[in-house]
């Protein structure tokens, strides 16, 4: 008689994805982030669900309801800060996961990669709308500034913005619909995650060498289940340290001031995980150009499979490409720093140079360096 986990239709699904899944024997800790992202999503959905039980999406009471959650609801402050800092953890894992994909050439699995880009966009949209919900100063002005960018679209721009707002400014209708979409999107993300895994399990995982590992596979359980549990433990510990010791470290103090349409904060800036894109947006003086650069800064990832000129898949044995990759990482950190700075003399030019370098590295320098490495292989 066959084992129930291999014969039962439902258990078979779980078995094929988490237990008997053949996995390369040499995947490193950089392959942990997929499962960590799954845990982040679960934490966000659960904490978000309980927060939604106490939150009211009305402009007059939204800020007050968040205060009520923190003061009067049992462990409401834990829920609120787990949710807010959980988003930061989510993005840290996302960036590391994408970085791993770039470094080891995982983008060669184009379907998995493209669904991943869709997921990145969906998570960014969810995070943006979630930031609006507490209805503080930065919530209101962030929503106003970012939605206003759509007015740069020729002909339909202004109508589109007013349609999204549900009026002539960010108001009750905007907050209500953002809450509705913020609640809905994580479930769409969950569905996309299933599609992402479906495509991944068609090809199997990549590994650090970038060489096919079909002849040397091991079962996912117990080897990688225990490895993932260690990663999860470290991440949850880091999240709890953040939540319990410095919950407001990554937030903006302006968001503790209730939204006031008559008073603009001195520096409008998004959460830290959007600062790199915000810096690229600000570095172009033209509105439409800035919006296009903003979208392309993420969409450019879809070109990675086309820009792969190397004969090797992974960067593991390509020192010149490694230099380019780490230069890209340093450039993104520079952009993140610039995004949080005021628009003043030294920062403007640094932001513009960093933006030019970002696109140059991905579109020109990395493919060129790969061609040079191919030539070096012939020597």
From Swiss-Prot:
GO terms for cellular component: mitochondrial inner membrane; respiratory chain complex III. Binds 2 heme b groups non-covalently. Heme b b566 binds at residues 97, 196. GO terms for biological process: mitochondrial electron transport, ubiquinol to cytochrome c. Keywords: Electron transport, Heme, Iron, Membrane, Metal-binding, Mitochondrion, Mitochondrion inner membrane, Respiratory chain, Transmembrane, Transmembrane helix, Transport, Ubiquinone. InterPro entries: Cyt_b/b6_C (IPR005798), Cyt_b/b6_C_sf (IPR036150), Cyt_b/b6_N (IPR005797), Cytb/b6-like_sf (IPR027387), Cytochrome_b (IPR030689), Cytochrome_b_C_euk/bac (IPR048260), Cytochrome_b_N_euk/bac (IPR048259), Di-haem_cyt_TM (IPR016174). Its cofactor is heme b. Its main location: mitochondrion. Heme b b562 binds at residues 83, 182. Coiled coil: none annotated. The chain crosses the membrane at residues 33-53, 77-98, 113-133, 178-198, 226-246, 288-308, 320-340, 347-367. It is found in: Mitochondrion inner membrane. It is a multi-pass membrane protein. A ubiquinone binds at residue 201. Component of the ubiquinol-cytochrome c reductase complex (complex III or cytochrome b-c1 complex) that is part of the mitochondrial respiratory chain. The b-c1 complex mediates electron transfer from ubiquinol to cytochrome c. Contributes to the generation of a proton gradient across the mitochondrial membrane that is then used for ATP synthesis. The cytochrome bc1 complex contains 11 subunits: 3 respiratory subunits (MT-CYB, CYC1 and UQCRFS1), 2 core proteins (UQCRC1 and UQCRC2) and 6 low-molecular weight proteins (UQCRH/QCR6, UQCRB/QCR7, UQCRQ/QCR8, UQCR10/QCR9, UQCR11/QCR10 and a cleavage product of UQCRFS1). This cytochrome bc1 complex then forms a dimer. Heme 1 (or BL or b562) is low-potential and absorbs at about 562 nm, and heme 2 (or BH or b566) is high-potential and absorbs at about 566 nm. This is Cytochrome b. The lineage of its organism: Eukaryota, Metazoa, Chordata, Craniata, Vertebrata.
